Curated annotation (Swiss-Prot):
The gene is pyrG. Allosterically activated by GTP, when glutamine is the substrate; GTP has no effect on the reaction when ammonia is the substrate. The allosteric effector GTP functions by stabilizing the protein conformation that binds the tetrahedral intermediate(s) formed during glutamine hydrolysis. Inhibited by the product CTP, via allosteric rather than competitive inhibition. It catalyses: UTP + L-glutamine + ATP + H2O = CTP + L-glutamate + ADP + phosphate + 2 H(+); L-glutamine + H2O = L-glutamate + NH4(+); UTP + NH4(+) + ATP = CTP + ADP + phosphate + 2 H(+). UTP binds at S14, K189, S190, K191, P192, T193, Q194, K225. Keywords: ATP-binding, Glutamine amidotransferase, Ligase, Magnesium, Metal-binding, Nucleotide-binding, Pyrimidine biosynthesis. CTPSs have evolved a hybrid strategy for distinguishing between UTP and CTP. The overlapping regions of the product feedback inhibitory and substrate sites recognize a common feature in both compounds, the triphosphate moiety. To differentiate isosteric substrate and product pyrimidine rings, an additional pocket far from the expected kinase/ligase catalytic site, specifically recognizes the cytosine and ribose portions of the product inhibitor. This is CTP synthase. CTP binds at S14, D149, I150, E151, K189, S190, K191, P192, T193, Q194, K225. It is an enzyme of class 6 (ligase). InterPro entries: Class_I_gatase-like, CTP_synthase, CTP_synthase_N, GATASE, GATase1_CTP_Synthase, P-loop_NTPase.
Length: 532
């Protein structure tokens, strides 16, 4: 079967939910028996988001093969239940880097290198590569940004050309826009959508479907107006209303026959999507009977998207126990030894996620101490594991000034030190220990019980690691190293035996959690928090 290509663009404003729309369509097509892959094109000039501030970009999502990518890839993986790779997130920086390397090699035979055709050809190659390497029936490509952005123009030109390259029956364009509701006038306005589509058509792209984000139901006469002015069928104007849960969106789109419209346009002969299991999930999510309050102690809590996968993994674990998750976002800069009890009052569990830099470090350490001393269930991730080790060294072993060499290079007790292979690394971007690595679990530990396995594979993103010079004396005081690299050299999981639930991992377990298959450490953490 010829691979089909679907392009999802956005207009009017950003953050309309293009990623959720693309992921939801991917789930519907997968449930129709199609093999689906999905990718995101980001128009920024950074090679990847690895060195960008979370306030600029949200979380960095890490794939199995170690790519640092856009957070939308997390949505893709969770919705479609597939593992993506480095080719699933393409930036302008990657495109230009590749074009310039080819120019230096002489691949263009002395020609003048231009946006058209050289840059656009490189973009098209990344689209087609996704289909070739996965042997997918359908490739869904989300174009980041909004129509009209100067940065997006080469990407839009490239996807325009693809229709001519492979034929109209093999390409589909879905455009996401906004229909604002003006409270003062008491009416909805279609003009922004009309102008956005006009802009898109001026670039040579006629959308086949328009997905309109709206707070209120769109009247039939407005759908007719949009269809008329934008030259599409009325049934191809799809409503994307705010949902109680993200996981309801595929069902809302299916109810409006989006997957049927796509299959008809692309001449896809496939079964109807069986969404029985998905409907059961949504029904469960909307009717949770329990409640658990988790404190997430971090320094980027003003932007929850910085911890998006962590929050979703907590919710997935909650679904398994019929419990809603109430996340208390605690700014670690506000936590002190004097107010930690007040800051964490009434929580059932404490989570310290990953991060970099020294801001808010002492507040996180105080939160960990409080969890350890008050026997409150605790889960640490990446930096959270490192700080749990430092807290124990300071307050149980009495190693004054114990710290991480990342935060204090002159510490007398570098509990956390640079990985040996990192000592000569100068570049910051793309040089961390990234991606999927094995971890050997110790029998009789909380970690081994959670996974019910001997060797596990989890995704990593770090440059510093536990210093083995302190392993023996910390073990003597009850600090357990329950997971290590297969050769025993790198510490992967630590835990406390005399605590109801205290465990921390160097890896990022949140990246592999799924709504119907919660990650084991999160599952056990929520179960312990419910018991508290």
């Amino acid at each position: 079967m010829t691979t089909k290509y679907i392009f999802v663009t956005g207009g009017v404003v950003s953050s309309l939910g293009k990623g959720i729309t693309a992921a939801s369509l991917g789930r519907l097509l997968k449930n129709r028996g199609m093999k689906v892959t999905i990718q995101k094109f980001d128009p920024y000039i950074n090679v990847d988001p690895g060195t960008m501030s979370p306030y600029q970009h949200g979380e960095v999502f890490v794939t199995d093969d170690g790519a640092e990518t856009d957070l939308d890839l997390g949505h893709y993986e969770r919705f479609i239940d597939i593992n993506l790779n480095k080719n699933s997130n393409v930036t302008t920086g990657k495109i230009y880097s590749s074009v310039l390397k080819k120019e230096r090699r002489g691949d263009y035979l002395g020609g003048t290198v231009q946006v058209i055709p050289h840059v656009t050809n490189e973009i098209k190659e990344r689209v087609f590569r996704a289909g070739r390497e996965t042997n997918a029936d359908v490739v869904i490509t989300e174009i980041g940004g909004t129509v009209g952005d100067i940065e997006s123009l080469p990407f839009l030109e490239a996807i325009r050309q693809i229709k001519s390259d492979i034929g109209v029956d093999n390409v589909m364009y879905i455009h996401c826009t906004l229909i604002p509701y003006l409270a003062a006038a008491g009416e909805m306005k279609s003009k922004p959508t009309q102008h956005s589509v006009k802009e898109l058509r001026s670039l040579g792209i006629q959308p086949n479907v328009i997905v309109v984000r709206t707070e209120k139901p769109v009247p039939e006469e407005m759908k007719e107006k949009i269809a008329l002015f934008c030259d599409i069928r009325k049934d191809s104007v799809i409503e994307a209303r705010d949902a109680d849960t993200l996981y309801e969106v595929p069902l809302d789109l299916q109810a409006q026959n989006l997957d049927e419209i796509v299959c008809d346009h692309l001449n896809l002969s496939c079964q109807e999507a069986d969404m029985t299991e998905w409907k059961s999930l949504v029904e469960k999510v909307k009717n949770l009977s329990g409640l658990v309050k988790i404190a997430l102690v971090g320094k980027y809590v003003a932007l929850p998207d910085a911890y998006l996968s962590v929050a979703e993994a907590l919710r997935h674990a909650g679904y398994a126990f019929d419990a809603d998750i109430n996340i208390k976002w605690v700014d670690s800069e506000d936590v002190t030894a004097e107010n930690v009890a007040e800051q964490l009052q009434g929580v059932d569990g404490i989570l310290v996620p990953g991060g970099f830099g020294d801001r808010g470090i002492e507040g996180k350490i105080e939160a960990i101490r409080y969890a350890r001393e008050q026997k409150i269930p605790f889960l640490g991730i990446c930096l959270g594991m490192q700080l749990a080790s430092i807290e124990f060294a300071r307050n149980v072993l009495g190693l004054e000034g114990a710290h991480s060499a990342e935060i204090n290079p002159d510490t007398p007790h570098p509990i956390i030190d640079l990985l040996p292979e990192q000592k000569d690394v100068e570049d910051m971007g793309g040089t961390l220990r990234l991606g999927l690595y094995p971890c050997k679990l110790k029998n009789g530990t909380l970690a081994q019980s959670a996974y019910n396995d001997q060797v596990i594979y989890e995704r990593h993103r770090h440059r510093y690691e536990f210093n083995n010079q302190y392993r023996e004396q910390m073990e003597a005081k009850g600090f357990m190293f329950s997971g290590t690299s297969p050769d025993g050299r790198l510490v992967e999981i630590v835990e406390l035996g005399d605590h109801p639930f205290f465990i921390a991992s160097q890896f990022h377990p949140e990246f592999v959690s799924r709504p119907t298959r919660p990650q084991p450490l999160f599952r056990e953490f929520i179960q312990a928090s419910l018991r508290k």
